[in-house]
Amino acid sequence: MAEVLIRKTDYDYQQLKPAFFEIVEKLAGDKIKSGQRVLIKPNLLSFATPEDAILTHPLVIKAAVEYVLEKGARPQVSDSPAIGSFERIVKMNKINVALKGLDVICSPFKNTVMLDIGKPYGKIEIARDAAEANVIINLPKLKTHTQMLLTLAVKNMFGCVVGFKKSQWHMRAGTDTDAFARLLIAIHQAVKPTVSILDG
């Protein structure tokens, strides 16, 4: 059975950090070991500022990085934006400022591997960093979505499909919401994030 924790805080880092640490420690603290590669997967869809509330807030990402570092593991923040360059999005969303001075890799997904996500989809190209990470911390952003109504933890793993391959899978599903939902579930189950912390 899935375990769910809810904590209310604002983006004051003195409040956010202990709340975030508490959640991750309770849900996945025993799964993050010293020396492991930990992928932190935020939602970095497109150009936006923290105030736009479209992307995972930079301080949520910072809390994840600091938690991983405290565990002695190796954090990497990555995504594959649908629109625009990863570097510009990181700068516009002030992630570069939040992560300044921290020992973390912050880079877009590039290399891919083929991952079997089951019938009827078969093998799909997934970011190598996601496929080979020891631990994945999924950091989705709570927001509306034209086709799926909401973007939550399951859909955020679709970002592990690199570059324009995402739009190709969107087109294959067309307007069939159920077909696209099944695809999202298949990808989520294949990539298997260790823990999901929803930035709402």
Predicted features by range, described:
Residues 1-200:
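N-terminal and secondary-structure boundary signal
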